[in-house]
Amino acid sequence: MSGQPKRLMVMAGGTGGHVFPGLAVAHHLMAQGWQVRWLGTADRMEADLVPKHGIDIDFIRISGLRGKGVKALLAAPLRIFNAWRQARAIMKRFKPDVVLGMGGYVSGPGGLAAWSLGIPVVLHEQNGIAGLTNQWLAKIATTVMQAFPGAFPNAEVVGNPVRTDVLALPLPQERLAGRDGPIRVLVVGGSQGARVLNQTLPQVAARLGDTVTIWHQSGKGAQHTVEQAYAGVGQSQHKVTEFIDDMAAAYAWADVVVCRSGALTVSEIAAAGLPAIFVPFQHKDRQQYWNALPLENAGAAKIFEQPQFTVEAVADTLAGWSREALLTMAERARAVSIPDATERVASEVSRVART
């Protein structure tokens, strides 16, 4: 039996912030000979994305409870029980040595199913404040890790696993030394875009004129509107794309990033070594604010809560950063990154599987 490959089931779904770090760890362990399967839901992004990465996926039926009506909340225990039964049957077939919960609704019933079968549960919290599922699962987990300090008081801070092409970028001093001309501003609202960025940055461009050049990811369906907004203020020279497929190339091009502060975005920007203006999504637990705070505290970024994200404030901030200041900020961002996060998570999974 000892010669058989170890088996891991990754439980992650819903958003890229959960799925991409899970894929990074899965690929790392597969390269070491592990067998990996995925537990997800059929109607979210993991259903298409995970099989494209050569990983088999099993589905359970589960969705979030936040913001649902009374009827849905009353039905929740039965839905969770059914999802737990489905996950338990899947794990009985696959017989994983360990499960890795990377967040999303699927982790709840999946983690409970693993625990009920005596399978060790390893948790990774990507955000600076723990989600409800992970708060609950932490009570039964063998090990809990966190990307940023503060989500769990005693968990090891290991960073967020990020894509290898971002980690492979040249260091800031190598990449940015000798650059001149307009400051290159990369605007990223996530794959869905961000209306506040789409409305504000064309006006910022009008104020700053030829001192900046902008590459703006508008999000799905917004490219034409954003292009018109730039053209309407005489700034049609800037580049607007609906989606950026090669984020590593975009980071390599940029001098500074203006973006939301989802956990994976913050970790990628730190790993790339880039200054940033963060505009946290206004969630009631301020999750994105807490994600961005370590970089602001390190002197690598500036946080604008959405009401403060005005044309004047952003234009003044960008105008006030010299190339020397941007390089210093870039180096500070890189200094607080944890580039071996994938290895750290994979190593803990391996350790738990051996014990």
From Swiss-Prot:
Superkingdom field: Bacteria
Residues that coordinate or bind UDP-N-acetyl-alpha-D-glucosamine: T15, G16, G17, N127, R163, S191, I244, A263, L264, T265, V266, S267, E268, Q288
Chief place where the protein resides: membrane
Cellular component per GO, a single term: plasma membrane
Membrane topology: Peripheral membrane protein
InterPro entries the UniProt entry points to: GlcNAc_MurG, Glyco_trans_28_C, GlycoTrans_28_N
Record-level Gene Ontology MF annotations: UDP-N-acetyl-D-glucosamine:N-acetylmuramoyl-L-alanyl-D-glutamyl-meso-2,6-diaminopimelyl-D-alanyl-D-alanine-diphosphoundecaprenol 4-beta-N-acetylglucosaminlytransferase activity; undecaprenyldiphospho-muramoylpentapeptide beta-N-acetylglucosaminyltransferase activity
Metabolic or biological pathway, per its Swiss-Prot or TrEMBL entry: Cell wall biogenesis; peptidoglycan biosynthesis
Keyword Glycosyltransferase included in the entry's annotation: yes
Catalysed reaction equations from the record: di-trans,octa-cis-undecaprenyl diphospho-N-acetyl-alpha-D-muramoyl-L-alanyl-D-glutamyl-meso-2,6-diaminopimeloyl-D-alanyl-D-alanine + UDP-N-acetyl-alpha-D-glucosamine = di-trans,octa-cis-undecaprenyl diphospho-[N-acetyl-alpha-D-glucosaminyl-(1->4)]-N-acetyl-alpha-D-muramoyl-L-alanyl-D-glutamyl-meso-2,6-diaminopimeloyl-D-alanyl-D-alanine + UDP + H(+)
EC top class, as a word: transferase
BP GO annotations: carbohydrate metabolic process; cell division; cell wall organization; lipid glycosylation; peptidoglycan biosynthetic process; regulation of cell shape
Keywords for this protein: Cell cycle, Cell division, Cell inner membrane, Cell membrane, Cell shape, Cell wall biogenesis/degradation, Glycosyltransferase, Membrane, Peptidoglycan synthesis, Transferase
Subcellular location: Cell inner membrane
EC assignment: 2.4.1.227
Function text: Cell wall formation. Catalyzes the transfer of a GlcNAc subunit on undecaprenyl-pyrophosphoryl-MurNAc-pentapeptide (lipid intermediate I) to form undecaprenyl-pyrophosphoryl-MurNAc-(pentapeptide)GlcNAc (lipid intermediate II).
Stated family: Belongs to the glycosyltransferase 28 family. MurG subfamily.
UniProt xrefs under PANTHER family: GLYCOSYLTRANSFERASE, UDP-N-ACETYLGLUCOSAMINE--N-ACETYLMURAMYL-(PENTAPEPTIDE) PYROPHOSPHORYL-UNDECAPRENOL N-ACETYLGLUCOSAMINE TRANSFERASE 1
Xref: NCBIfam families: murG
Protein name: UDP-N-acetylglucosamine--N-acetylmuramyl-(pentapeptide) pyrophosphoryl-undecaprenol N-acetylglucosamine transferase
Source organism (scientific name): Salmonella newport (strain SL254)
Lineage of source species: Bacteria, Pseudomonadati, Pseudomonadota, Gammaproteobacteria, Enterobacterales
Gene name of the encoded protein: murG
